[in-house]
Amino acid sequence: MDLKLKLAEAHSVRISKAIQHYVKSDRERFQRLVAILLGEDRKLAQRAALAVNWCFDYDSKPFEECAPRLIAAFLSRPDLHVAVRRCIIRNLQIIEIPRADQARLYDRCLMILHQEDQTVAIKAFSMQVAFNICESFPALKRELKEAIRLNLESNGSPGVQSRGRKLIKKLAEA
């Protein structure tokens, strides 16, 4: 299957599912899909994001192997389509973050919490990623708790409120 041609057809659940069934756990195919996700064509990248999520849900191993590359793009490319950023941070909540990337990713997640123009999903996922990193660095928990608390005061979105309250409760228990 030519992934670019398939994604160019339309932005649909049917096409994303077809790509997920084609890619499954095949690392080479997943690498090709990630290349589109991080590519210059924003429309194709946006369309690839859903397929990457479904491939991740099927098998997270290929995503974990690409994690350093995806984290680097998330940290250094402000031009990434919001769907691509959401896809990357969504899946980073679930995997173990490579040690070499934890500090920079934690800082970026905190920065996201303070940005009013970020989407609800990206903020909620960023809270979780930062919390997961705090499990390895307990000294960061107080800083994260304060950042979440401030975010709860300024952001009335149910998604941010729900995730924030749950994480503050977990941080208080620690």
Regions found by a protein language model. Name each.
Residues 1-174:
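Alpha-helical scaffold domains
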